[in-house]
């Protein structure tokens, strides 16, 4: 391949940072970006061993990666991890904000502490990840935030705090896309539906009526019926869409939220 040849969807020469990528959807995103040729910064808060294992998997794909610890609830740590990423790889082209927490609770029972716990990571942290991404990214960069199909399209009882924390992301994306135009940076979000990760079995019972009466295997089978495609969603399904949004082919996709739930919502 000559220097002037463009390979569609490939990310050679790009540097990507994925927050909360020690496991689950974030890990799949980091691995996919590495598979597409990007150098990857694997950010983690507590999952050091899985993050370091993921770095090795990415390196085995023929690219480079590094694991950097940061609690992105703290803005100073967001700044530090992006500074360190730029110092290590010489630049930054793609920032994916994945870190988040789930929450269930009836409106009448939600505490101030629970509200703040959820919004501090799902909403506030994502805002400042985007701010620092804008400040650190090269021109023609990509910011990809994380919403949820429950933000607007899929209503779930006892889920108002989580849904609201993700709904704010959809407003952020539309306005941030305008703000980032001066650097030719696109801003988009993915909005997954139910996805089978290591957290799936802890939360699936809340999405399915009388879910607490069913086994983990039964819950997964029941969740598969929500999509007209009659299968579960997996982290790689989300990662493939992120890979597209990160690519040159997505340069005309901007300020958009892409729901990735197999048609469930």
Swiss-Prot record:
Coiled coil: none annotated. NADP(+) binds at residues 25, 98, 131, 162, 166, 197. Disruption phenotype: Impairs the production of monodictyphenone, but still enables the synthesis of intermediates until emodin. The keyword Oxidoreductase applies. It holds the Pfam family adh_short_C2. It catalyses: 3,8,9,10-tetrahydroxy-6-methyl-1,4-dihydroanthracen-1-one + NADPH + H(+) = (3R)-3,8,9,10-tetrahydroxy-6-methyl-1,2,3,4-tetrahydroanthracen-1-one + NADP(+). Pathway: Secondary metabolite biosynthesis. It is an enzyme of class 1 (oxidoreductase). The active site is at residues 147-148, 162, 166. GO terms for molecular function: oxidoreductase activity. The keyword Hydrolase does not apply. Transmembrane segments: none annotated. Short chain dehydrogenase; part of the gene cluster that mediates the biosynthesis of monodictyphenone, a prenyl xanthone derivative. The pathway begins with the synthesis of atrochrysone thioester by the polyketide synthase (PKS) mdpG. The atrochrysone carboxyl ACP thioesterase mdpF then breaks the thioester bond and releases the atrochrysone carboxylic acid from mdpG. The atrochrysone carboxylic acid is then converted to atrochrysone which is further transformed into emodin anthrone. Belongs to the short-chain dehydrogenases/reductases (SDR) family. This is Short chain dehydrogenase mdpC. It comes from Emericella nidulans (strain FGSC A4 / ATCC 38163 / CBS 112.46 / NRRL 194 / M139). The gene is mdpC.
């Amino acid at each position: 391949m000559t220097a002037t040849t463009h390979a569609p969807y490939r990310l050679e020469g790009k540097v990507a940072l994925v927050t909360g990528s020690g496991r689950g959807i974030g890990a799949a995103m980091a691995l996919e970006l590495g598979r597409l040729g990007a150098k990857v910064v694997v950010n983690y808060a507590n999952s050091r061993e899985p993050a370091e294992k993921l770095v090795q998997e990415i390196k085995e794909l023929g690219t480079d990666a590094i694991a950097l610890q940061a609690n992105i609830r703290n803005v100073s740590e967001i700044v530090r991890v992006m500074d360190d990423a730029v110092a290590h790889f010489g630049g930054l082209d793609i920032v994916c904000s994945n870190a988040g927490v789930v929450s269930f609770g009836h409106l009448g029972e939600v505490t101030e502490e629970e509200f703040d716990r959820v919004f501090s990571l799902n909403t506030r942290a994502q805002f400042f990840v985007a701010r620092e991404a804008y400040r650190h990214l090269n021109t023609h960069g990509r910011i990809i935030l994380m919403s949820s199909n429950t933000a607007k399209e899929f209503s779930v009882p006892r889920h108002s705090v989580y849904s609201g924390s993700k709904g704010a992301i959809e407003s952020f994306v539309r306005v941030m896309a305008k703000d980032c135009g001066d650097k030719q940076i696109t801003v988009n979000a993915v909005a997954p539906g139910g996805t089978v990760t290591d957290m799936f079995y802890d939360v699936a019972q809340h999405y399915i009526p009388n879910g607490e009466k069913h086994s983990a295997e039964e819950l997964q089978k029941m969740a598969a019926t929500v999509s007209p495609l009659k299968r579960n969603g997996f982290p790689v399904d989300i990662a493939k869409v992120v890979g597209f949004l990160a690519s040159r082919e997505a340069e005309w996709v901007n300020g958009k939220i892409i729901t990735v739930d197999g048609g469930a919502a």
